[in-house]
Structure formats: structure tokens, C-alpha cells
């Protein structure tokens, strides 16, 4: 999202903006592979641009939030490109689906609105460790159907497995307008973590 890109750039962060193939020109898991390949590329190349591979943070909104979760929790996708998803400093999915994405259900000809939880659902991979994360959702009364509730379910699973995670519900913000407060929240958290890293 351009709002994420510009929001983080204004905070002084080096930002790698990622595109991925879209259905119907491709099918699952091509777009998950694209996201994992991009994060792996960042680990391999960010130091050439003055970045620090120990300080790589991953975020995305909506479908990008789903891909953020899959890259961080389903570690086999990063491993395919020779990188360890556990090396991600922190993940910040914004309003991401935590069940199998509705695009995948559409590919299978399944009806809209009925959740599927299989290997393409981020919550399936809870309990396997992974990067610390902040789950961010819009207001449960303004978000897309069950989006807050899905994130709350994932957070409950992560907490059960002692995963370093927290869920923020941005009250008064819908699926689209959640981006502005999300950028502020994420930026503040990264700056705090950067200060801690520098003291090590």
C-alpha cells in the first residue's frame, strides 16, 4: 500500500515495497512464494543499501497482512529461499485474514463467507514459533466481516503457545482508515526496538 510505503519513509525507515502476482493470473501458493522471496531478497541484499539484516520488519495491509502472517508463521516458504523466518525482527500484519484467504476459497469455487482453515490459514501455523508480532485490526464494528474476530482467535492461539504477540483494535477506524494509526503504532514500536538494539 502506498500509504504504508510513504508513512514509513517519512519516519526515516528504509522501505522495500513488494508486489506479488494476483489471481487469476496465478494461483495459491504463488503469491505467498512471491512474498517470501521478496523478504528473503531483503535479508540477502539490505546491507548493500545501508540497512541492517538484524533489523528487518515485515508489514502489510489486508491481503498484505495475510501474506505477512504466512511469511512469518509458515516458515517453509522462507526456507525455500534459504532464509529463516525466525530472523524477522518483528511482524506487523494489519487487518489480515487469519483463516485461509477468501481469494483461495474463490479459486476453489467455494462460497463466500464460509471460513476454511487448512495449510493456507495463518492460524494453522500458530505454535511453531516465529517472529514476535503485533496484530492490528480496525474496529470490530467497522471492519470487514469477522476480521477483528479472526485476529482475536489467532491471538488466543499464539498466547496459548507463549508466542510474543499482542492484538490492537483501532477503535473508530474501518478496514481502509486503519492504515494511518497503524503506521503511527508500528513506527513507534520499531523506534523503541531500534534503541534497544543499539544498546546491545
Each model region followed by its residue ranges:
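Residue-level signal for short, function-critical loop segments
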Residues: 62, 139-141, 173
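Short beta-to-alpha linker loops that shape the active-site pocket of alpha/beta-hydrolase fold enzymes
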Residues: 14, 19-23, 97, 171-173
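Loop/turn elements at helix/coil->beta-strand transitions in domains of secreted/extracellular proteins
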Residues: 11-16, 53-55, 86-90, 130-133, ...
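C-terminal catalytic histidine-bearing segment of alpha/beta-hydrolase fold enzymes
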Residues: 152-155, 159-200
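Primarily recognizes the serine-hydrolase "nucleophile elbow" in alpha/beta-hydrolase
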Residues: 37-107, 118, 122
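Catalytic nucleophile-loop/oxyanion-hole region of alpha/beta-hydrolase
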Residues: 1-5, 16-53
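The feature captures the conserved acid-bearing segment of alpha/beta-hydrolase catalytic domains
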Residues: 82-104, 113-152, 156
Amino acid at each position: 500500500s502506498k500509504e504504508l510505503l510513504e508513512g514509513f519513509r517519512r519516519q526515516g525507515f528504509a522501505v522495500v515495497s513488494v508486489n506479488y502476482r494476483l489471481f487469476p493470473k496465478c494461483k495459491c501458493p504463488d503469491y505467498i512464494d512471491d512474498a517470501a522471496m521478496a523478504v528473503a531478497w531483503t535479508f540477502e541484499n539490505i546491507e548493500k543499501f545501508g540497512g541492517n539484516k538484524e533489523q528487518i520488519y515485515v508489514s502489510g495491509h489486508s491481503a498484505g497482512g495475510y501474506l505477512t502472517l504466512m511469511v512469518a508463521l509458515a516458515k517453509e516458504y522462507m526456507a525455500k529461499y534459504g532464509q529463516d523466518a525466525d530472523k524477522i525482527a518483528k511482524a506487523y500484519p494489519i487487518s489480515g485474514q487469519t483463516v485461509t484467504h477468501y481469494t483461495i476459497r474463490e479459486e476453489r469455487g467455494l462460497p463466500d463467507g464460509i471460513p476454511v482453515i487448512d495449510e493456507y490459514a495463518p492460524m494453522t501455523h500458530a505454535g511453531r514459533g516465529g517472529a514476535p508480532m503485533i496484530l492490528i485490526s480496525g474496529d470490530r464494528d467497522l471492519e470487514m466481516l469477522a476480521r477483528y474476530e479472526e485476529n482475536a482467535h489467532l491471538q488466543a492461539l499464539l498466547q496459548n503457545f507463549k508466542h510474543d504477540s499482542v492484538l490492537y483494535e483501532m477503535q473508530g477506524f474501518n478496514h481502509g482508515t486503519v492504515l494511518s494509526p497503524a503506521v503511527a503504532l508500528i513506527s513507534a514500536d520499531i523506534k523503541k526496538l531500534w534503541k534497544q538494539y543499539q544498546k546491545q
